[in-house]
């Protein structure tokens, strides 16, 4: 195999694998639906990307079934003409998760799964290992602010940190040496159908942990592990002392966050979290546990936690001035919205907070619109955008207005994505603006930031 072609190369997981093959010397190119900051960066790195579902756009060298591997994301529709062509003409066509499983099979994979928190936890775990004497490789589900990439490579470590995605049961292709499960709140009901099926998928994932490995499971998570007899089980919590790993003495002071980390046989006091948000304490406890189990010393943990800068779009402070603060967050599930909004309320107590939310998927909106409305009602002002459909076709009667009508706050409105800047221009800007969503709302972050800067 000499060449790898990606259908959906702009996805966060796909782009990491594309970068991996490019770094290993393969000829790499791909298709995506629209340009994005990720595709812009891939092009800068020398990877050819086009944005039309058109076989004529693919370099001729890739039309060789014996030399070319075709990788696609499940988000691509089944009738995509490029995908259909390759499937019909003898090419090896595989999902992203299958390739990731093969890449990690010969290494010791540290896999982070969960409905929420897996990107921050895996990125933090990778940083703890990377800045220690242990080192690691990593395929991340977000862009690390420490390394400005979603791919980390090492020439000395056989550890690989992997964000284990439950969508389409993708994480069943992995063979973890150790794993973290951060949560198992039902999601992707269009795939799983029931909450029981969703949780069963996580339980099957635990059965894949290799002999001699370990599972670090959030204390109280609704998952019954199916572990081999020689796989260790540990629990963790942000504050419950019944867990094997937990935090205590959590203190936020002058914009800084400190806590004590407890582990079997000891504790580490005065740990400072580089991203001082309370929701990250729990993620830190889990990441520190796996890092410690793999040889990172407690003092290396202390320095690594303090130097962690977070991930793009994970409670990322984009603008911080005396006039206004802009925070960008990937939250797209009600539990994630709750966490983000509670964190903003805690950090900016007494401030007027506006949330701009773009619902993600018609199916998720239909499942959770009441919960979304309940979460958003905690804000002082709510701006709703239209639903981002991603891979889905519209569902009858499912629009953002379902959420809007149930928000218990008169300061609410529904605007189109294209009209958002005009809306902001015409209204009083509050103390804090919180951008929320997993769709293409990220493309509005810079324009919103630029406008807010004119007010300072």
Curated annotation (Swiss-Prot):
GO terms for biological process: cell division; cell wall organization; peptidoglycan biosynthetic process; regulation of cell shape. SUPFAM superfamilies: MurCD N-terminal domain, MurD-like peptide ligases, catalytic domain, MurD-like peptide ligases, peptide-binding domain. InterPro entries: Mur-like_cat_sf, Mur_ligase_C, Mur_ligase_C_dom_sf, Mur_ligase_cen, Mur_ligase_N, MurCDEF_pg_biosynth, UDP-N-AcMur_Ala_ligase_MurC. It is an enzyme of class 6 (ligase). One of its GO terms (cellular component) is cytoplasm. One of its GO terms (molecular function) is ATP binding. The keyword Nucleotide-binding applies. It is found in: Cytoplasm. Pathway: Cell wall biogenesis; peptidoglycan biosynthesis. Its EC number is 6.3.2.8. It catalyses: UDP-N-acetyl-alpha-D-muramate + L-alanine + ATP = UDP-N-acetyl-alpha-D-muramoyl-L-alanine + ADP + phosphate + H(+). Pfam families: Mur_ligase, Mur_ligase_C, Mur_ligase_M. ATP binds at residues 114-120. Keywords: ATP-binding, Cell cycle, Cell division, Cell shape, Cell wall biogenesis/degradation, Cytoplasm, Ligase, Nucleotide-binding, Peptidoglycan synthesis. PANTHER family: UDP-N-ACETYLMURAMATE--L-ALANINE LIGASE (PTHR43445:SF3), UDP-N-ACETYLMURAMATE--L-ALANINE LIGASE-RELATED (PTHR43445). Belongs to the MurCDEF family. Cell wall formation. NCBIfam families: murC (TIGR01082). This is UDP-N-acetylmuramate--L-alanine ligase. It comes from Porphyromonas gingivalis (strain ATCC BAA-308 / W83).
């Amino acid at each position: 195999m000499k060449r790898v072609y990606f259908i959906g190369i702009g996805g966060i997981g796909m782009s990491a694998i594309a970068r991996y093959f490019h770094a290993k010397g393969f000829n790499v190119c791909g298709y995506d639906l629209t340009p994005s900051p990720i595709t812009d960066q891939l092009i800068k790195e020398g990877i050819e990307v086009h944005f039309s579902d058109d076989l004529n756009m693919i370099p001729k060298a890739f039309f060789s079934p014996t030399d070319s591997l075709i990788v696609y994301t499940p988000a691509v529709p089944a009738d995509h003409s490029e995908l259909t062509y390759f499937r019909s003409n003898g090419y090896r066509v595989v999902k992203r998760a299958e390739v990731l499983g093969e890449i990690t099979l010969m290494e010791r994979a540290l896999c982070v799964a969960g409905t929420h928190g897996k990107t921050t936890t895996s990125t933090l775990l990778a940083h703890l290992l990377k800045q220690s004497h242990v080192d690691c490789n990593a395929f991340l589900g977000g862009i690390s602010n420490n390394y400005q990439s979603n791919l980390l490579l090492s020439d000395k470590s056989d550890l690989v940190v992997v964000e284990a995605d439950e969508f389409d049961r993708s994480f069943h292709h992995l063979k973890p040496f150790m794993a973290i499960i951060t949560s198992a709140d039902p999601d992707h009901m269009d795939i799983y159908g029931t909450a029981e099926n969703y949780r069963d998928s996580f339980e099957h994932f635990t059965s894949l942990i290799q002999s001699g490995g370990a599972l670090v499971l959030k204390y109280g998570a609704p998952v019954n592990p199916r572990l081999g007899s020689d796989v260790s089980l540990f629990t963790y919590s942000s504050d419950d002392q019944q867990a094997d790993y937990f935090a205590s003495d959590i203190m936020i002071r002058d914009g800084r966050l400190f806590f004590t980390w407890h582990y079997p046989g000891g504790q580490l006091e005065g740990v400072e979290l580089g991203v001082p948000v309370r929701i990250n304490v729990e993620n830190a406890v889990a990441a520190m546990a796996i890092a410690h189990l793999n040889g990172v010393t407690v003092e290396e943990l202390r320095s690594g936690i303090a130097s962690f800068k977070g991930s793009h779009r994970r409670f990322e402070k984009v603008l911080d001035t005396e006039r206004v603060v802009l925070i960008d967050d990937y939250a797209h599930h009600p539990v994630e919205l709750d966490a983000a909004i509670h964190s903003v309320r805690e950090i900016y107590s007494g401030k007027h907070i506006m949330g701009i939310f773009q619902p993600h998927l018609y199916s998720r909106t239909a499942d959770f619109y009441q919960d979304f409305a309940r979460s958003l009602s905690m804000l002082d002002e709510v701006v709703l955008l239209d639903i981002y459909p991603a891979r889905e076709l519209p569902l009858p009667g499912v629009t953002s207005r379902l959420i809007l009508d149930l928000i218990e706050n008169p300061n609410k409105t529904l605007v189109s994505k294209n009209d958002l800047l005009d809306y902001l221009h015409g209204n009083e800007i509050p103390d804090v603006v919180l951008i929320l969503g997993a769709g293409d709302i990220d493309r509005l972050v810079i324009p919103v930031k630029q406008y807010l800067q004119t007010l300072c």
